[in-house]
Amino acid sequence: SGAGWVGLDNFAQLFGSRLGRNAIFNTLTYVAIVIPASVGLGLLVALGLHGLAGSLPRITNTLKAVYFLPVAATLVAMAVSWQMLLHPSLGLVNTWASALGWPAPLWLSDRDLVLYTLAVIGIWQTVGYNMVLFLAGLAAIQPSLYDAAEVDGATGGWSRFWLVTWPMLGPTTLFVLVVTAANAFRVFETVATLT
């Protein structure tokens, strides 16, 4: 009656049950939404703030702090804030929706919406951290590379991005992708706290 070796029985049980397969599908869907959206938005915000840094440094620093705030917030504080915002009758989101004549859905209770609601919250949590990492990568790009690209004919912002910025952000982007993927797969705490 001692402990026995189960081998891969737990995995067989997980993949064999409908509940287990559903959990895996939902996690993969969540990850497929959160990773590209949070990496893309983090890059866009970093590019915007990097471009503003020279002309509006105080505003840029304030915006950096605002975007990074969700990273520094505790899970409980974040969960309470989102529960208040998404409350079915008292929440700010549904109040605005009702004022516009839209239906007020149950964001955290409706089976068809909760996964996407959690994905939006996951993106919100991650964008600030990704922004900081991309800002560090942008700061490491030598200005002389942009000068050389301009001499070679890359005069527009888009060509400068594709020929200099994006290739030089390769290592940073890889790191951001790995960290974002690891965080996206650790979604249990958010789900357990909010739903």
Name what the model sees in each region.
Residues 1-195:
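A structural signal for multi-pass alpha-helical bundles of membrane permease subunits
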